[in-house]
């Protein structure tokens, strides 16, 4: 994580009716499950699933876009094959029920969740086992529906691990990190819910906002984020948790099959800035079924095709991830 750590840190008729109300409210009508589990990716009314089509454009949207790069192309930071010897994207694993938990020694222990993490033998690590990058490890425990995420995770050789930070998320809950706390991501957000997955694209629908990075952020966070990763107070830099929406003028029909659901999601749910990194880089899960040539066509979409939006109307409480519909 490119941080500058400023602080250490849902079948009855009634259910069908509720689903219809959710659609009318601008929230998702269903809770897609984590593949291989019965776990939903947070409740359907969680901020990740909120629709932002009607969110107002910020008055300084142009400045924010220019800071990220108005002429820079959109990038799928995921795909098939290898890059520098590692899978392209951020992998995750559904661990076996009862997977033993191991102790993790955290650099930012005051903002990390203790209690042990169910790290399997030879877990999938972002960038590969030999990577010196962000080295995220994402694990889903399928019986309790708990998501465990680590940043900068390294084995110690004695069965224990060390990591920069870690967060444990109840996927059945809208609980958030304490304000000011990081997670395994700079913004204090969960990572897995914001990743583009092949199974979603193959099904033709991504029902959530997409995790995105920017090269320069400011010393601020906006709900649902809880942590910043910069010392700059420049108001024209995005905050952690800043939301960008793809303009409706971008026609997904002009793009190949694997790209269309991504474009629709960016117009419907938008992108959330979760870390410092490269301009307009979207995060996703590596999968050998990705067609990298199709994904590269996303570069035709430029920063100027985005607007920065005000997502504050979604918030019910700053310490909850539950979102309310926009007018």
Located regions from the model:
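Alpha-helical transmembrane segments
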Residues: 13-17
